[in-house]
Amino acid sequence: MAKHSKSIPGRGLRVADQIQRDLSEIIAFELKDPRVGMITITEVQVTPDYAHAKVFFTMLSDKKDDIKNTVSGLTAASGYIRGQLGRRLTIHTLPELHFVHDTSTARGIEMSKLIDEANASRAKDAED
């Protein structure tokens, strides 16, 4: 019993990775909703009981309206997506999908710009 409970986190990560791969294929090749354009699934977080999965995605557009439309399209199609996912996965509980726009890429770009500005300022101060 104790051995099984220790292996759950590793299994949870494997399940989340498999869900991420399958969702990417389903959304790219099977989903026909015009509100959902080209998106990238960046991460999937699954609860320990596999009841819920938080699906993080990025897209080319950073406009709030485009993001809102994409989230509503994914949410509206979540039943279909979950059904297709159920045909691919062999787990007892198929998680309910919650789609969230991933802002980590934009934050990373902003941080990179700040670092570049600080380095340029430091170089300018060194010249003076």
Swiss-Prot record:
Keywords: Cytoplasm, Ribosome biogenesis. GO terms for cellular component: cytosol. Gene3D superfamilies: 3.30.300.20. It is found in: Cytoplasm. The keyword Cytoplasm applies. The keyword Cytoplasm applies. GO terms for biological process: maturation of SSU-rRNA. GO terms for molecular function: ribosomal small subunit binding. InterPro entries: KH_dom-like_a/b, RbfA, RbfA_dom_sf. It holds the Pfam family RBFA. Its main location: cytoplasm. One of several proteins that assist in the late maturation steps of the functional core of the 30S ribosomal subunit. Associates with free 30S ribosomal subunits (but not with 30S subunits that are part of 70S ribosomes or polysomes). Required for efficient processing of 16S rRNA. May interact with the 5'-terminal helix region of 16S rRNA. NCBIfam families: rbfA (TIGR00082). Monomer. Binds 30S ribosomal subunits, but not 50S ribosomal subunits or 70S ribosomes. Belongs to the RbfA family. This is Ribosome-binding factor A.
